[in-house]
């Protein structure tokens, strides 16, 4: 046999999991806090670390089109982010920041989830659940997407809680709910025009303090 002949037999590739200690609260007055909604991680420049939980969701538009998405929920005893904290939110998924055990949630800094502008005719990039804008001469993305070259060769505005500007009623329509109570989903992307791409829709962030 192979074993008796002295020929070594190697096992299959394994995996190594390194578990970092997590904080139970997010309380910071300064430094940089990075929220990565693709990895499901929050990291602070002082080394603090917290993992989120992914939830699979699907929004079905009025025309029957399904839009699957994921929400990342980060839960801590207390969340307090002072004005000196620089918050960087990266990744495609919308996020929910929640407290537990009747913990307080205080936000003194800014979480920017603005949709990106078109950099070079390819359409702006969305973050935190915002849909990408359409490239030059291409419709935007999302349930309330803007049409390409809608008015005077310019791209049509997209929608979410309010209707965007478009003469074609199959575009730029409102969807979900403005208060994000049913679906934590971002805004749609604008349509590309004759000369430029469309801007991306804004992202979605939920702040939830556990009640008494």
Where are these regions (language model features)?
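Glycine-centric low-complexity/flexibility signal
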Residues: 1-71, 78, 93-96, 102-212
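Structural recognition of beta-strand segments within beta-rich domains
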Residues: 81, 87-90
């Amino acid at each position: 046999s192979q074993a008796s002949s002295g020929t070594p037999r190697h096992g299959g590739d394994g995996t190594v999991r390194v578990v970092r200690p997590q904080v139970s609260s997010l309380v910071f007055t300064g430094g940089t806090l990075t929220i990565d909604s693709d990895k499901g991680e929050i990291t602070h420049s002082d080394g603090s670390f917290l993992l989120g939980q992914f939830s699979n969701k699907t929004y079905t538009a009025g025309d029957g089109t399904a839009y699957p998405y994921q929400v990342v929920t980060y839960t801590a005893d207390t969340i307090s982010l002072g004005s000196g904290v620089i918050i960087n939110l990266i990744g495609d998924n919308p996020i929910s920041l929640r407290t537990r055990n009747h913990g307080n949630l205080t936000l003194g800094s800014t979480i920017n989830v603005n949709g990106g502008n078109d950099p070079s005719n390819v359409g702006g990039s969305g973050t935190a659940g915002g849909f990408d804008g359409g490239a030059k001469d291409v419709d935007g993305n999302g349930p309330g997407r803007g049409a390409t070259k809608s008015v005077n060769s310019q791209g049509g505005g997209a929608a979410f809680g309010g209707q965007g500007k478009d003469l074609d009623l199959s575009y730029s329509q409102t969807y979900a709910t403005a208060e994000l109570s049913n679906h934590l989903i971002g805004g749609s992307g604008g349509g590309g025009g004759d000369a430029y791409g469309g801007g991306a829709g804004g992202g979605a962030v939920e702040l939830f303090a556990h009640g008494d």
